[in-house]
Amino acid sequence: MTVIALAAGKGTRMKSPLPKVLHPVAGRPMIEKVIQASKQAGAAEVRVIVGHGQNLVRQVVEPMGVACYVQDEQLGTAHAVRCAKPETIEGVVVIMNGDHPLIEASDIKDFVRIFRDEKCDLAVVTAVLKNPGEFGRIVRHKGDLAAIVEAKDASAEALKIREINTGIYIVKASVLSEYLPQISNNNAKKEYYITDLIALCIQDKCRVQAIQSTPKVAVGVNNQLELARATRLLFKRKALRLMEDGVLMIDPRTVYVEESVEIGAGTVIYPNVFIRGRTKIGSFTVIESNAFISDCEIGDSVQIRGGSYLESSKLHNKVSAGPYARLRPETEIFEEAHVGNFVEMKKVKFGKKSKAGHLTYLGDAEIGEEVNVGCGTITCNYAADKKKYKTKIGNRVFVGSDTQFVAPIEVGDDAIIGSGSTITKNVPAKALAVARGKQFIKENYSAKTAETEEKEQV
């Protein structure tokens, strides 16, 4: 089986400089969804027709192992298929649009199976819609496919038909090679339409069939509203699958999980959560409202409190983060550690059972086990030379509130750092380090100040 994906159009109704097929649907370009479904369905080869913005399209699709064929002028769907050199293909050919992101591998497999079982020469996939709109109508005679009539050319009677052409075709390569050159552009737009292939095959009494499918396969994307609808449907599909696998969603309508995300059974997700990228989440984890998680690895029984923002980080089992924690790339939080509210970390290894409860920034740091990091602690990792330096803190260290570590610096095991300190030198194990201005007291100072001010006013 070979798939030809049509992706050369400008997509002018998108009103965007980005080629239409590259617009993201639930996190990935829609053409990528079509290619992925084709490969999962067993396609030996996928040929993508490119044209408008072809360099950008190639950057996305060629790493997926597909071949690109150029349609320099957009002269219709049949012309696009010609550009794929069908005479070099053998077996079964599936033709579909690159802007149908809801197509699944199981759909393609079913279409090809029916095509083969019915010994078809050509088949068109159809669907019955409540509002057929501008879709081409399927005209049947005694149940068999008789013609496809475009909406703009249809009579009032034909417009009442609700069965439509989805734009997906399955055809023998030999039939495609024979009849494709016979398609003319004798129409108002002077374009070559793939639907004319049906008429030619019916005329020559080829075995032509209409395979009726579900409305989802008809969901194409031509404007931003349709893009949003397709995205919503994909998020809904993902949410349903996760819930079937044992994930609890308080309100799945407001949970947005991209297809690439993996989540274990028993995990609870509150409303208004977005999880994307290559994220993997274990079992019995709780993710509270307004959390954003991207490309993270999260273990079992983790607590992610509301408003937390996590990206490219790893959280081991029984970690708690937030509310309003921010974990930036290359951060790793080990078992049973706690990252509290308004704590930000970047490039940090935060040890087992360590705690940073509030209002803290740790960057380019290695923090040992069972460390207590007091409120307002900062690792000063960025120097005037525009280089970043590392802070290393050993096990069981107590860091008092409002401490600054001026990197590069190391603190040994079991050390104590006094509150309000600016630490600029290494601290040995078990040592006490205090670096702050000496406190002094002036007795009755406020009373004397008030008396002076009163005299000045007189």
Swiss-Prot record:
Pfam families found in the cross-reference section: Hexapep (PF00132), NTP_transf_3 (PF12804)
Cofactor(s) for this UniProt protein: Mg(2+)
Region (Pyrophosphorylase): 1-224
Function: Catalyzes the last two sequential reactions in the de novo biosynthetic pathway for UDP-N-acetylglucosamine (UDP-GlcNAc). The C-terminal domain catalyzes the transfer of acetyl group from acetyl coenzyme A to glucosamine-1-phosphate (GlcN-1-P) to produce N-acetylglucosamine-1-phosphate (GlcNAc-1-P), which is converted into UDP-GlcNAc by the transfer of uridine 5-monophosphate (from uridine 5-triphosphate), a reaction catalyzed by the N-terminal domain.
Enzyme Commission (EC) number: 2.7.7.23, 2.3.1.157
Entry keyword Disulfide bond: no
Name of the protein in question: Bifunctional protein GlmU
Enzymatic class: transferase
GO terms for MF: glucosamine-1-phosphate N-acetyltransferase activity; magnesium ion binding; UDP-N-acetylglucosamine diphosphorylase activity
Cellular compartments per GO CC: cytoplasm; membrane
Residues holding acetyl-CoA: N381, Y382, S401, S419, R436
Binding site for Mg(2+): D99, N222
InterPro entries attached to this UniProt entry: Bifunctional_GlmU, GlmU-like, GlmU_C_LbH, Hexapep, MobA-like_NTP_Trfase, Nucleotide-diphossugar_trans, Trimer_LpxA-like_sf
Assigned protein family: In the N-terminal section; belongs to the N-acetylglucosamine-1-phosphate uridyltransferase family. In the C-terminal section; belongs to the transferase hexapeptide repeat family.
Gene name, Swiss-Prot/TrEMBL: glmU
